[in-house]
């Protein structure tokens, strides 16, 4: 999506069309107009995106209207997100889609922004003063985008109600782990009948046996990364370490496959699976999957899978590899849609900004999907499938 006149007109038309879906959520003309102007500013090629630059892009005399939109005017960001999600499903809905849970960090200064503290941020790769947001991504055959979000509040916040009130956090909002937030997002997707087939997440979420059990009881198929110390039920033990299932596996059981394209080409690993929990229903299977580095065979990652009996290893590899789609969403949303360009401190303000930035990213994804449909896109296809490949993992 370049800055040419045709692209600009295309963007303007699609953003306006998406905006019209939720314009009824605002009771006054000012926030209606400001929401559209805000989204247009987030996608504009501005060096910095803040209240002043977005106001200037919108032709406002100052940032007051932007600040009122994010901090003071009464509107429900969750209701707007419902409308954005409907837009995503209408244009990108896929019964074979994968729901992906992950979190990302937003580096901040000071101590007054809701949820901020010194905590590990994957964005920085170290402990930094930051906010952490938990997100749900939707990855289908035509594209991937973000469809849900929650700001993580550490106990340093939830145990201090005066501090919470100063940041606009209601007394009813208590501490929740990131896994609990993730579970709520997936439950909402199920309740709203969003079309999907799989759920996946990294080991920070997949290690939760409670969540895996909940998904299984709802008959939700999943491939969840876990740690080598996780345990499963086998014929030999009730708590069998997953890393102990593979050392004696015959060589022919390992398959070299790509789980998708990375920055340096196909991500190729050696893969194997072992069936566990053999006394379950006939039409379902449980597997532990191992992903071994080609260049460094001592580096092995593990996954727990719950799936239909006929599911192939290649399909499970595809789902495991789909997790990287959420990282692509974060990168694109931050670089092109202003996801991390905000100066709000209040809890509602964070969710409002994220909702409008996610709307812009959804619009971007839909437009690129249309280009793919007409053969005009210059980007890679939106989904990758495992295939035999001579390239090794980096």
Residue ranges and their predicted role:
Residues 2-200, 204-221, 228-231:
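Conserved, well-structured functional cores that handle cations and Mg-NTP chemistry
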Residues 16, 125, 141-167, 171, ...:
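An anionic, glycine-rich sequence signature occurring as long contiguous blocks
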Residues 24, 28-31, 48, 195, ...:
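Intrinsically disordered or highly flexible coil/loop and linker segments, enriched in small
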Residues 101, 105, 205, 311-344:
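Short amphipathic alpha-helical "interface-anchor" segments enriched in bulky aromatics
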Residues 132, 299, 325, 352-358:
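Catalytic-loop motifs flanking and including active-site residues across diverse enzymes
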Residues 208, 234-235, 353:
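Short Asp/Glu-rich motifs
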Residues 332, 337-394:
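Basic, amphipathic alpha-helical segments enriched in Lys/Arg and hydrophobic/aromatic residues
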